[in-house]
Amino acid sequence: MVQRVIAGLVLVGLLPISANTVCAQNTGQNQPEKPPTTYYWHNWADHNGVSHMTKCPLHHYTLKTMNKPAAPQWSDELFKGEARIISTVQPDHWNGVWHTDPKVQWIIPLQGTWFVQAMDGTRVEMGPGDISLGEDQRTLPDAQGHKGHLGGNVTSGPVTLIVIQLAEAPTVDEACRFK
């Protein structure tokens, strides 16, 4: 029998499973299950100050309990340290114009769909279950004055996000730094 293992970031207890999660299978022979792989979008800056959106894997999962007697689950500890958690609701037709993220931050849509467009022209639409890491603080204005990323709502109505800001410096030229 095939069992689906729910995998995702253990950042927020109400985080739904990403549509981009690859689940492990149990062959029924008491063999260890293969760890899952899930994905996030990384908005990062290169050494020329240009932002990019790259789809990145998370795949260093271990099967363990979060707290006994709970059953084991796949977890991948990505960050340990100070963080700030913010719930945001972007109004209908919200347009974020070109801007940088204020901090290195994970952004998790809970309701509705929004988009991020990097300076290189890559545009990604994200909805519930998708995960984004915003780290474009070290971008430089291009010829049109664009810096960071363009963001806005795709769907009608409000878009609800959970934002987890990390107390750490942004990197440069490190796409997919959380692996």
Give residue ranges: language-model regions.
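N-terminal secretory signal peptides that target proteins for export/translocation
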Residues: 1-3
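Short, Lys/Arg- and Gly-enriched loop/turn segments at beta-strand edges
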Residues: 64, 139-151
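Short, conserved beta-strand element in jelly-roll/cupin
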Residues: 89-90, 100-116
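Short acidic-glycine-tyrosine-enriched beta hairpin
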Residues: 120-138
